[in-house]
Swiss-Prot record:
Residue spans crossing the bilayer: 26-46, 60-80, 102-122, 136-156, 168-188, 201-221, 235-255, 278-298, 310-330, 344-364
Glycosylation sites: N193
Name this protein carries in UniProt: Sulfite efflux pump SSU1
Main location (coarse class): membrane
Cited CDD domains: TDT_SSU1
Presence of keyword DNA-binding: no
Single GO molecular function: sulfite transmembrane transporter activity
Family: Belongs to the tellurite-resistance/dicarboxylate transporter (TDT) family.
Lineage, top ranks: Eukaryota, Fungi, Dikarya, Ascomycota, Pezizomycotina
Length: 375
C-alpha cells in the first residue's frame, strides 16, 4: 500500500499529466473550432427573429449571444497562445490542405456576434451600438476578403489535392465574404447615417460578387467529384450540408441589401429614382432562385446521411450554421413576401437548428472534457 509520500507522488504525476493534456489540447487547436461560434451565433439570431415568438424566447437568445461572445474570446485567446508559443504551427496550418480551409470559420463566427449586437443590443442601447457594430463589421469584412482571396490561391499554388480528396470544406474560405456581405446589410439597415449605409451596401454588393460566383464554381466541381467518386468519407459526411450555406446566406444577403437600397438610394439621389426598387425586386427574385437551388443540395445532404453510420467530430457543427443561414433566407422571404408558408417553414427550420445545437453542443462539451476532440 503506498505511503503518504507515495500518494503525493501519484497526485503530482496526475497533475503533470493533466497539464500536459492541456498543452496538447492547445497545441492541437485549429481554426475549425470557431464553427462553434457560427452554430451558437446563428441559433441566437434565429430565436431572436423567430416569426412566431413566445414569452422568454428573447432571453434565451440573449443567453446564447453572451455564451457566444465568451466562447469566441476564449477560442481567440487559445489561438493567440498557440501561435505565440509555436509560430511554426501557423505556417503549417496555412500549408495544410484541410486546416487552411477552416480559416473562414473565424470571420463567420465573428459576424454572428455583430448581427446579434444589431438585433439584441441596438434596440436597448441605441445608435452608438449600431456604430460600434459598424466598426466591427469593417474588421470582419477585411478579414473575410483576405481569407477568400488568399486561401484559394494557396490551393492553386501550395496545396497538394485531387478531385477524389475534395470535400465541400473548399467552400468555407469563399463563403466568408458572403456572410460578411449579409451581415453588412443588417448593419447598414440599423445605421441612421444614410451615406454610411450607402457605402456599406455598395461594398457588400462587391463582396457578394467576389464570393457567390466563385462558390458556384466550387459547387460545380464538388458535384463532379460526387458523380465520379461517390460520397465523401463518413468522417466528413456532415460537410454535405455546407453547399446550402452560400445559397441561403447569399439569398438572404441580396434581400437585405435590397431593403436598404430601396430606403437609401432615393434619399441620396443615387442612380435613377427607381434604382432602389429595382435592386430590391431583383434581390428578392435571385434569392428565390438560390433558395430553390439550396433545396436540392439539402436533399442530397439528407439522403447522404442515410447511407451509413458516422461518428461525432468537430465537423458536426455543420449541422447548425449552413441550415441556419438557409433558414434566415426562409424567414426573410416570409417577411418580405408576407407569406405564412415561409413563416411556418422558417419556424420549423429554426426549431430543427436549435435542437441540433443542443445535441452538438452537449457532445462537444462531453468530448472536450474527455480530451477525445484534441487527439
Amino acid at each position: 500500500m503506498p505511503s503518504g509520500s507515495g500518494f503525493q507522488n501519484i497526485e503530482e504525476a496526475g497533475e503533470k499529466a493533466r497539464r500536459r493534456d492541456d498543452w496538447i489540447a492547445i497545441s492541437n487547436f485549429h481554426p475549425g473550432w470557431f464553427s462553434v461560434n457560427m452554430g451558437t451565433g446563428i441559433t441566437a439570431i434565429l430565436l431572436q427573429n423567430l416569426p412566431y415568438q413566445f414569452p422568454g424566447l428573447h432571453y434565451i437568445a440573449v443567453v446564447l449571444f453572451v455564451l457566444n461572445v465568451i466562447i469566441f474570446f476564449f477560442f481567440l485567446t487559445i489561438s493567440i497562445t498557440r501561435y505565440a508559443l509555436w509560430p511554426e504551427k501557423f505556417k503549417a496550418m496555412l500549408a495544410h490542405p484541410a486546416h487552411s480551409m477552416l480559416l473562414g470559420t473565424f470571420p463567420m463566427g465573428f459576424a454572428t456576434i455583430i448581427n446579434c449586437i444589431i438585433f439584441i443590443c441596438v434596440p436597448v442601447w441605441g445608435d452608438w451600438a449600431a456604430r460600434f457594430a459598424w466598426g466591427l463589421w469593417w474588421v470582419d469584412a477585411t478579414v473575410s476578403i483576405a481569407i477568400c482571396y488568399f486561401v484559394p490561391f494557396m490551393l492553386m499554388t501550395k496545396h497538394t489535392s485531387s478531385l477524389e480528396t475534395m470535400t465541400a470544406a473548399w467552400l468555407l474560405p469563399i463563403v466568408a465574404p458572403v456572410v460578411a456581405a449579409a451581415s453588412g446589410g443588417v448593419v447598414a439597415d440599423a445605421l441612421k447615417n444614410d451615406t454610411h449605409a450607402l457605402i456599406t451596401i455598395l461594398v457588400c454588393y462587391v463582396m457578394w460578387g467576389s464570393a457567390v460566383p466563385l462558390a458556384m464554381v466550387i459547387l460545380v466541381i464538388y458535384f463532379q467529384r460526387l458523380a465520379l467518386h461517390k460520397l465523401v468519407p463518413r468522417a466528413a459526411i456532415v460537410s454535405a450540408l455546407l453547399p446550402i450555406g452560400p445559397l441561403g446566406q447569399g439569398g438572404f444577403g441580396l434581400m437585405q441589401l435590397g431593403v436598404v437600397a430601396r430606403r437609401v438610394f432615393p434619399r441620396l439621389d443615387f442612380l435613377a429614382p427607381i434604382a432602389g426598387e429595382i435592386f430590391y425586386v431583383m434581390g428578392a427574385f435571385i434569392a428565390m432562385i438560390m433558395w430553390g437551388f439550396g433545396l436540392i443540395w439539402l436533399w442530397f445532404a439528407l439522403a447522404s446521411f442515410t447511407r451509413g453510420k458516422f461518428y461525432f467530430n468537430i465537423g458536426w457543427w455543420a449541422f447548425t450554421f449552413p441550415l441556419g443561414v438557409f433558414t434566415t433566407a426562409t424567414t426573410q422571404m416570409g417577411k418580405e413576401f408576407n407569406s405564412v408558408v415561409f413563416d411556418v417553414l422558417g419556424t420549423f427550420f429554426s426549431i430543427v437548428v436549435a435542437a441540433m445545437w443542443v445535441m452538438v453542443f452537449a457532445l462537444t462539451v462531453y468530448k472536450s472534457c474527455t480530451k477525445e476532440l484534441f487527439k
